[in-house]
Regions:
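Long, highly charged, low-complexity intrinsically disordered interaction regions
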Residues: 195-263
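Nucleic-acid-processing active sites and adjacent nucleic-acid-binding tracks
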Residues: 112-145
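Short glycine-rich phosphate-binding loop at a beta-alpha junction
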Residues: 7-10, 146-155, 177
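Extended, highly charged clamp/arch subdomains and adjacent linkers
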Residues: 1-91, 110, 133-138, 142
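Short acidic, glycine/serine/threonine-rich loops at helix termini
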Residues: 19-24, 102-110, 119-120, 159-162, ...
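Gly/Thr-rich phosphate-binding beta-strand-loop-beta motif of the actin/hexokinase/Hsp70
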Residues: 86-114, 214
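Short alpha-helix plus adjacent loop in nuclease-associated cores
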Residues: 124-126, 175-216
Length: 263
């Protein structure tokens, strides 16, 4: 608010009490010639130099305390995201929703291997709902999909409605879960994703990430800069060095706690 020039925050202090205290400390002998001048000097020094310096120090201390508290919350949020229990033994359909460019799909087997990818256009402006349902039914039947992992971004609600309608129409039991897709776009355009899926476009990588986030959240999310995972608001207002160190420490702790498969 202050940066936008909308709010003005000040620290109010008992000025009269402070000036009386300073007068007693500075003016040791009452002299009708010097006392008035010294009082003016004390008042000017307090108003112009001492009070602003103390206010800056207090606000800096409070800001640091607030930042430390916020960073702790961000760390807890990140830990909860990383330590979500994995869902094993399921063939998952990752669904990266969108409007104009279509919804990207990726079928992933229980080991995380990508079996198939495609794009459907059930949302506006194309609204090719029946065509999309036909594609989905074929994928479910062919790969025995048991779980749909739907990203919570743009067109998520519209995609969810299509999934709900589809599940009513098919005889097999398939469930769906909405997952947080924060950081998926960052990962899908990263060098790591390009090396992992050199023949996939950004949409295919993002849909794959949606599926794998359900299967093994920790293994998938460690590929992304912790600040891009969506651990809280106003991250950019924090001390970036402290935030990076804190979130990096959380990632290390979680990986150490779970362990790493060297194979």
């Amino acid at each position: 608010g202050e940066n936008e020039k909308i709010l003005n925050v000040k620290v109010e202090a008992p000025e009269e009490e402070i000036l009386r205290y300073l007068d007693r400390k500075v003016i040791t002998k009452d002299n009708p010639m010097t006392t008035p001048v010294l009082k003016e000097v004390v008042a000017d020094a307090y108003d112009r130099l001492i009070a602003p310096a103390i206010e800056r120090e207090i606000r800096s201390s409070l800001t640091e305390m607030a930042e430390d508290g916020a960073i702790r919350v961000f760390g807890k949020n990140l830990e909860q995201l990383l330590m979500q229990p994995p869902i094993a033994g399921q063939v998952v359909l990752g669904w990266d929703p969108a409007f104009r460019t279509g919804c990207k799909l990726a079928v992933v087997d229980p080991t995380g291997k990508v079996l198939d990818t495609t794009v459907i256009y059930p949302t506006a402006p194309q609204n090719r709902v029946e065509e999309a349902k036909a594609v989905l039914k074929k994928l479910i039947a062919k790969y025995h999909i048991t779980l749909i992992s739907l990203g919570n971004g743009t067109a998520s609600r519209e995609s969810e409605q299509i999934i709900v309608d589809l599940l009513r129409e098919i005889p097999v039991k398939v469930q769906y879960i909405i997952v947080n897709e924060a950081g998926a776009s960052v990962y899908s355009a990263s060098k790591l994703a390009t090396e992992e899926f050199p023949n996939f476009d950004v949409g295919q990588r993002s849909a794959t990430s949606m599926a794998r986030r359900l299967q093994d959240p920790l293994a998938e999310l460690v590929k992304i800069d912790p600040k891009s995972i969506g651990v809280g608001q106003y991250q950019h207002d924090m001390n970036q060095k402290k935030l990076t160190e804190a979130l990096g420490g959380v990632v290390e702790d979680c990986v150490n706690r779970v362990g790493v498969d060297l194979n």
